């Protein structure tokens, strides 16, 4: 129900933490979708979001009917403007990621929760440790296989080039470091 509340206030997407199974991934996407009649186009995953987006309509600056037309998950619905991001933060999630991306339409991106992942691997916050980097590389490879954007949560000017070369396309950086990092990453990605 928390996804409904955030979306009803006008959020354009939800980042779902600790997604480790196909069922959890399906539920995450379903929570961001309105129900449809069985057999209708784009039925699966069946939506479970309740109605009531009056704040979202005002925030988005559109009519209620326009909101209903756009309030579906992209890329499942090409016209959809709701973005579903799954956080993979443990080895169970890594093991199940291929099945998630193969069987659950509507996942817009995968974000690696490297803090929790590094904890489970026994190297807390040692983001450059080989075991952590290897686990993250598995996630990147799986996302590339399914052409799903993969995100890195700790981009700095010092690691931006490596991260972009590794295939990350959704880059996050902390506010105090963001301007220099943003400019460097934009240049590396050819977006200056």
What residues fall within each predicted segment?
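Alpha-helix-loop-beta-strand connector modules within alpha/beta enzyme cores
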Residues: 31-42, 76-79, 128-151
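Catalytic beta/alpha-barrel core
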Residues: 12-21, 85-89, 127-131, 149-154, ...
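Glycine-rich phosphate-binding active-site loops on the catalytic face of alpha/beta enzymes
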Residues: 12-24, 110-119, 169-187
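Small/polar glycine-rich anion-binding or flexible loop at a beta-alpha turn
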Residues: 154-161
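Glycine/Thr-rich beta-alpha phosphate-binding loop at enzyme active sites
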Residues: 112-133
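Conserved anion-binding
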Residues: 1, 9, 13-105, 114
């Amino acid at each position: 129900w928390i996804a409904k509340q955030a979306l009803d206030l006008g959020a354009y997407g939800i980042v779902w933490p600790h997604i480790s199974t196909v069922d959890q991934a399906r539920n995450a996407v379903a929570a961001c979708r309105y129900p449809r009649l069985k057999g209708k186009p784009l039925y699966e995953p069946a939506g479970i979001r309740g109605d009531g987006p009056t704040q979202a309509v005002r925030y988005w600056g559109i009519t209620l009917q326009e909101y209903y037309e756009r309030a579906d998950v992209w890329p499942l619905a090409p016209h959809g403007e709701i973005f579903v991001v799954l956080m993979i933060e443990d080895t169970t999630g890594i093991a199940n990621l291929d099945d998630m991306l193969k069987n659950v339409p509507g996942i817009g991106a995968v974000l690696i929760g490297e803090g929790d992942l590094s904890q489970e691997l026994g190297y807390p916050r040692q983001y450059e440790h080989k075991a952590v980097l290897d686990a993250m590389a598995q996630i990147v490879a799986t996302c590339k296989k399914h052409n799903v954007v993969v995100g890195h949560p700790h981009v700095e000017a010092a690691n931006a080039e490596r991260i972009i070369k590794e295939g990350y396309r959704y880059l996050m950086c902390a506010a105090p470091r963001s301007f220099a990092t943003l400019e460097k990453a934009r240049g590396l990605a050819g977006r200056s």
